[in-house]
Amino acid sequence: MVERELKVRPIRSGTVIDHIQAGQALNVLKILGISGTTGATVSVLMNVSSRKLGKKDIVKVEDRELREDEVNKIALIAPGATINIVRDYAVVEKYAVDLPDVIVGVVRCQNPSCISNTNEPIKPKMLVKGKNPVVLRCFYCDQPLTERIAEYLL
C-alpha cells in the first residue's frame, strides 16, 4: 500500500493551480494580485516532488475562482499548469492552461522604441509563436520575448 503524505489541508472551495514550474509560484501570486495584506487564505508549496516535472510548485487560493484573463497570464509563466476548481472539497472542474494565439494588453514589448511603449494610445499586442516554452513576438516591431516574461506583465 502506498502511503501518501498530506502537506497542506484540502480547501473547501476555490482554485488549486498545480504543475507550476518550480520557482514560479511567487510570480503566480503576483499575477493574481495576492500579497500578504489581501486577506485571502493562500497555500503555496514550492519545489514539491513530482513524477512528471521532477519538482513543481502548487498554489491554493480559497474562496476564489480565476477569471479567464488571470488564467491566460498564468499560462505565460507556467505553460504546463493545471487549474482545479474546488467546491465542497471536491474538484468540479479541471483543465490545463492554454494561451490564445494573440495576447492584447497583458505583456509589454521589451523594445523601448516600440510604438506600444511610446505615448501613443496603443495597447501592446503579442503573437504567441510557441506555447511550451512560451515564445512571444511583438505584433508591431517583431521583437521576440522568450525569457523573464513575468517582468513584462502589465
Swiss-Prot record:
<comment type="subunit">
    <text>Contains catalytic and regulatory chains.</text>
</comment>
<dbReference type="Pfam" id="PF02748">
    <property type="entry name" value="PyrI_C"/>
</dbReference>
<keyword id="KW-0862">Zinc</keyword>
<dbReference type="GO" id="GO:0006221">
    <property type="term" value="P:pyrimidine nucleotide biosynthetic process"/>
</dbReference>
<feature type="binding site">
    <location>
        <position position="141"/>
    </location>
    <ligand>
        <name>Zn(2+)</name>
    </ligand>
</feature>
<dbReference type="InterPro" id="IPR036793">
    <property type="entry name" value="Asp_carbatrfase_reg_N_sf"/>
</dbReference>
<feature type="binding site">
    <location>
        <position position="138"/>
    </location>
    <ligand>
        <name>Zn(2+)</name>
    </ligand>
</feature>
<feature type="binding site">
    <location>
        <position position="114"/>
    </location>
    <ligand>
        <name>Zn(2+)</name>
    </ligand>
</feature>
<dbReference type="Pfam" id="PF01948">
    <property type="entry name" value="PyrI"/>
</dbReference>
<dbReference type="InterPro" id="IPR020542">
    <property type="entry name" value="Asp_carbamoyltrfase_reg_C"/>
</dbReference>
<dbReference type="InterPro" id="IPR020545">
    <property type="entry name" value="Asp_carbamoyltransf_reg_N"/>
</dbReference>
<dbReference type="InterPro" id="IPR002801">
    <property type="entry name" value="Asp_carbamoylTrfase_reg"/>
</dbReference>
<feature type="binding site">
    <location>
        <position position="109"/>
    </location>
    <ligand>
        <name>Zn(2+)</name>
    </ligand>
</feature>
<comment type="function">
    <text>Involved in allosteric regulation of aspartate carbamoyltransferase.</text>
</comment>
<dbReference type="GO" id="GO:0006207">
    <property type="term" value="P:'de novo' pyrimidine nucleobase biosynthetic process"/>
</dbReference>
<dbReference type="GO" id="GO:0046872">
    <property type="term" value="F:metal ion binding"/>
</dbReference>
<keyword id="KW-0665">Pyrimidine biosynthesis</keyword>
<comment type="similarity">
    <text>Belongs to the PyrI family.</text>
</comment>
<dbReference type="GO" id="GO:0009347">
    <property type="term" value="C:aspartate carbamoyltransferase complex"/>
</dbReference>
<protein>
    <recommendedName>
        <fullName>Aspartate carbamoyltransferase regulatory chain</fullName>
    </recommendedName>
</protein>
<dbReference type="InterPro" id="IPR036792">
    <property type="entry name" value="Asp_carbatrfase_reg_C_sf"/>
</dbReference>
<keyword id="KW-0479">Metal-binding</keyword>
